[in-house]
Every structure is written in C-alpha cells, then in structure tokens.
Amino acid sequence: MNNSNIDNAGWSFDNTYSKLPKSFLSITSPTPVKSPELIVLNDDLVNELGLNFSKISKKNLSELFSGNLLPEGSKAIAQAYAGHQFGHFTMLGDGRAVLIGEHVSKSNERYDIQFKGSGKTPFSRNGDGRAALGPMLREYIISEAMHALNIPTTRSLAVVKTGENVVRENVLNGAILTRVASSHLRVGTFQYIAARQNEDELKTLVSYTIDRHYPNIKKSKNQALDLIEVLMQKQIDLVINWMRVGFIHGVMNTDNMTISGETIDYGPCAFMDIYDPKTIFSSIDQLGRYAYFNQPNITKWNLARFAECLISLIDKNKDKAIEMATEIINSFEKNYEIKWLNMMRDKLGLFGEDTKDQILILDLLNWMHKNKADYTNTFCYLMDEKIKSDPIYKSENFILWKKRWEVRLKINNNTPEKYFKLMRSVNPLVIPRNHKVEEALEGANNENLTQLNKLITILKKPYQNQKSMMDYQSPGSINGKKYQTFCGT
C-alpha cells in the first residue's frame, strides 16, 4: 500500500520521551487489524495540528488511524506508570495504548499522538489490549465537548472500527481511538519511577517534566517543591472547571491525573442533570469515592501522593522535606475555596466580593438539591427565562432567592450587559446529556451515525443559542433506571 500521502500529510515528529531511560517505556507496535473503517475524523483538530489529509483516501486514513500504517518519523512505545486505583497502589503502564510519537505543529506546540485500543503491550497483564466502539466514541464525544467548554483536556482526533470483535460481558465492535495530549505524563508516572528508588531516574523525570510543561520554574532553587505548587494550582483550576459544568470524572485514580493539568480518561464519566452533590455514575464506585462533591478532596489526596514521590529531591533532611511539601498540600483548601467562590460568582454574574456571597450561593445550591432542579438549566433560566423555563422556578422560595440575587447584581457598578456577558461565558446552554450520548452510541453500534454526528455538532458551541439545541437541553432517563457508566476496559 502506498504510504507517501500519509507521510506527506504534514507530520513533524520529535520523539523526546522515547529517549528517556529504558525503564520509562517499552518499545512496541500496534497490532494490525483486519478491516479498519474510519467512523469519525476531527477536521477541526486536524487543522489545529497543521495536518492535511485532503489527498488521502478514506481507506488509507482507516489504515493510518488503526495503526496498520504508521507515518514516517513515528516511534511507537508504551509508557510505564503506576497508580492508586480506588486508593490501592498498583504497577500499571499502557496496557492497551501505544504512543506513536510527539508531533510538533507549525506554531511549535508539542502533541502526543496515541492509539488507544491498539493491541497488547508488555504492560497488558491479562488484558487483550483492545477497546470497544462505544467507549472510544464516548471519549471522542465528551473530550471534544470538554474542549468546547474551555476545560483543559486531551483531545480526540479519530475513531476507527477494527473489523474485529472484542469480548467483554457481550461481544462488541472493536475500535481504536486516536488521542492527542500535551503529554501523557501522570502522577502515576512519578509513582512508578519513585517506586524504583533510583534517584537519578527521578531527577531525569523532574527535569523532563519542567522542560516540557513548566520551563518558568527551570531556574528555581527548589524545582521539586515548585513543581508540587504549580501542579496543585493547575489541578485546582481543572477540578473547579469540572464543578462549574457538573462533570463527574468517575475514576480519579492517580494514573488519571496528568502533570499538564488536562482531563484524561473518559471511561465512566458523565454530566450531572439533577443537582445532587453525592451524584455518582460509575458502576464500580459503590462507596462514592469519586462522587461530584468529593472530587476536590480526591484531587488533594492525589497531589499528596505526587508530593511523596519528590521528598528525596526537596531536601536531604527527610523530615524537613516532608514539612515543606505538607505546607503546600495543606494550602489546597484555602486556594480551592477562593477559586470556587470566584467561579460561582461568575456563574451568577457577580462582580467584586460581598460578605454574603457564599450564603447566597449555598442557598441556591441547597434549593436546587431539595427541589431536584437541573443544575445546567437553572443557570440557563437565570440568564434568560425564555431559554429554559420550568414550573419549578415559580416556587416561592426560588422567587425570594432570586430577589436577593437581583439586589446583589447591582453592586460594583454592575449592568445587565456586563453580568449577562459574564454568565454566558461560563454557563453552557448544552452539555453532553447522558441519554443523548447513549442514543448516539447505540446508533453507531448499529451503523447509524446520524445521532452521533448531530450530537458532536451541537456540542461544538455550548455557549451559543442554537436553533436545534432545545432537544439537547432536557434531562432524560435511561428506560426509567438510574444512569450508570462503565469503564470500558
């Protein structure tokens, strides 16, 4: 098969991670698949990467994104990492994913290009290395929705069907997702290297991470300590964004916390409809470890595990190093509270600060919880009663709260033009409603891509009032049952 058009599509690989010590990775290749078929290609991301596939046939694109054909300059590896999974430490690694290389765009941005579901690797343990179509399309839908919501995230470039079945509880269509990320460095990467107790390797990893993501701390007197601080701020910003839109990750293991501050791994994730801080969707999170309200606490817990990895580099005196790291981690709550309060002020169009703001915000959330109000639609109603009306907003308690809010809006020279502009920038009109995601996945599994393509299109502009969005705004039920998600591994 002619590979020239694929090689001439604009790829520019500069593979730095594969030059790290052998313990960091394993050289491997995607396992060829029988008859790949391209299901969805992200044209917007293609352009952002500076690629041009116009001269490549759909058949050859299918071969490319299945891993059957690799572009010139790529170097396929599986990355080693560990992780606390639901609090239990495990040695892991890319068990069903292959990083084919680091593509550098014309604007000098570096991107990992990874195939997920591409076959067995040395880290697969007892897994088959494969993925099913539903979970790969779910990641495509939700990661791209998160990007449109202005939330840091890995991206999805393409999904192909492999033409082969994967066996889980049922026999499913096999698929491969092409994931694009600033990097795949994780807290779990540091845990893996720290567990090897090789300080030179740990220093190499810290240096590599700073060069790649945080060059502003390169001249720091204590790089390890500053790396903890900068990652904490990144992760606080990320989880606050999740809370802003009602996103529940579902599997916040340390191997799913990136050093770049991007959301990664969309296995059992979902968006909250009715506001309930204890909402969980994941079938394997029976105790609610990763419930909506607990996401900040888990973020802090994961950061503490990250800090533990760096103790030996912070100070030669272990007790002093622990004290210094602990001081940073213990500042999490205060930093989070300030940023969360500011985020909620933005959602309500409030400028400046007022001592009663927190009470006003909590009273609204408590009302929403008590009255089973839709989280997203409540803020839509406050922006424009015509966008999403509901009899629930005619209740006496809500009207009384709304009057207090309207009084607060007038503080600090606020005007309707100013506060509505602010609210519209942070309150989405549409989110990936769970029933709509399921409809799209069911259609795709039955070779009907209509609902999938409609959903992807509507989610590209979540802050804009679109003619066809009304059908995507209402919460739904999955055959009247409580909605559950599954990790898809």
PLM segments and residue spans:
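Short, mixed-charge, low-aromatic patches
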Residues: M1-N5, T16-L20, R96-G101, K161-V166, ...
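Regulatory N- and C-terminal appendages and interdomain linkers associated
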Residues: M1-Y81, F86, F281, Q286-T489
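Short, contiguous strand/loop micro-motifs
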Residues: S29-P30, D128-R130, L225-D226
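Conserved ATP-binding subdomain of kinase catalytic cores across diverse folds
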Residues: S35-L38, D43-L61, S66-S220, I259-E262, ...
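ATP-dependent phospho-/nucleotidyl transfer catalytic cores
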Residues: P135-M136, N165-H249, S260-N366
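Hydrophobic HxD+1 residue recognition
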Residues: V251-M252, M257
